[in-house]
């Protein structure tokens, strides 16, 4: 009986520990990393010599 209850308890503990720090991970990701990737990709696209 201990083994079937282990996985739900482990998942609930993981989620309860992860949820408070999730904004600390997502805010820099969305605010800094995604715009940086977008700027690099748009720069590479603009600098292509091909005309479609």
UniProtKB/Swiss-Prot annotation:
Keyword hit for Cell membrane: no
Keyword annotations of the record: Chloroplast, Membrane, Photosynthesis, Photosystem I, Plastid, Thylakoid, Transmembrane, Transmembrane helix
Membrane topology: Single-pass membrane protein
A GO cellular-component term linked to this record: photosystem I
GO biological process, one term: photosynthesis
Subcellular location(s) of the protein: Plastid, Chloroplast thylakoid membrane
Transmembrane segments: 21-41
Domain of life: Eukaryota
Family: Belongs to the PsaI family.
NCBIfam families for this protein: PS_I_psaI
Function: May help in the organization of the PsaL subunit.
Cited HAMAP family: PSI_PsaI
Protein name, as recorded: Photosystem I reaction center subunit VIII
Organism: Pinus thunbergii (Japanese black pine)
Gene giving rise to this polypeptide: psaI
């Amino acid at each position: 009986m201990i083994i079937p209850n282990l996985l739900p308890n482990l998942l609930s503990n993981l989620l309860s520990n992860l949820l408070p720090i999730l904004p600390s991970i997502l805010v820099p990701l969305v605010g800094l990393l995604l715009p940086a990737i977008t700027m690099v990709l748009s720069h590479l696209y603009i600098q292509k010599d091909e005309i479609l």
